[in-house]
A protein has these predicted regions:
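Zinc-dependent deaminase catalytic domain
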Residues: 1-255
């Protein structure tokens, strides 16, 4: 379980024990709060989050990017009746991945359609693959008020035979957890139930932030056999010294 209390309301999410997925009680809580409350979530998430589980790199990364503070491994005990508190569950205990309302249409094309588009543009070397990622990013609608639109960021994942496994584009204008790489990894789980296989290569227009890097690393069959290529070096602390950097998995290729 993970929970946060704000102004007399306890928001909580539960996750099945022993289930492996690119999700957790913490991830469900954060994704669900943004899906329900959008920008007001930032006010709720100024408060400390608590979880009964130990933190994974995935959980740590998501908290660093969209929340503030978290305490892990708390032990529940009966405090008796807590008058004046309201309890709001985010999702239900049986859900692995929380359905989200703000996943853009650009994220819902079939793998076959995207694979066909990639296959129509011959690409072998990483620099050329990153050009194709930039092409996918151009699917994201943009406008003059940048805050109101998703960022033009895209990523795709190939297996060791060069076949497309998943893709994602940024859709975080309302739900701040829905970065391109998060969408990619969670789609892979929804459609296959399997982790990123050994020998896979992920191409992203931008360097994965700590949230995305944590989820990628968490949902790898063998992280030591993964390569991540990106072209845009993101500025700011949220993309510095990620778990992918620490394990030498990131490869920067500038345009």
């Amino acid at each position: 379980m993970a929970f946060v209390e704000d102004k007399g309301t306890v928001y909580f999410a539960r996750f099945p024990v022993g289930v492996a997925a690119p999700s957790s009680a913490v991830v469900k809580l954060l994704q669900g709060l943004f899906d329900r409350f959008v920008d007001h979530s930032f006010f709720i998430l100024r408060q400390r989050i608590y979880t009964t589980a130990g933190l994974t790199e995935m959980c740590r990364g998501m908290v660093k990017v969209v929340a503030k503070r978290i305490t892990e491994n708390i032990r529940p005990r009966d405090h008796g009746e807590l008058a004046g508190l309201q309890f709001v569950e985010i999702g239900d205990a049986s859900q692995i991945l929380l359905p989200v309302a703000y996943l853009s249409q650009e994220n819902q094309k079939s793998i076959q359609e995207v694979a066909g588009w990639l296959g129509s543009h011959a690409a072998v070397i990483p620099a050329r693959q990153l050009e194709l990622a930039s092409g996918l990013a151009r699917w994201v609608p943009r406008g003059s008020v940048l805050h109101d639109y998703d960022r033009d960021i895209a990523a795709f994942l190939l297996n060791d035979q060069g076949q497309l496994l998943s893709y994602g584009v940024n859709s975080n204008s309302k739900n701040k957890t829905l970065h391109a790489e998060v969408n990619l990894v969670q789609r892979l789980h929804r459609e296959t139930g399997r982790p990123i296989p050994a020998g896979a290569v992920l191409y992203s227009t931008h360097k994965p932030c700590k949230m995305c890097a944590g989820m990628i690393y968490h949902w790898c069959e063998d992280p030591s056999q993964l390569k991540v290529y990106y072209s845009v070096e993101e500025k700011g602390g949220l993309s510095r010294q990620t778990v992918l950097d620490q394990h030498g998995l990131n490869h920067h290729i500038s345009k």
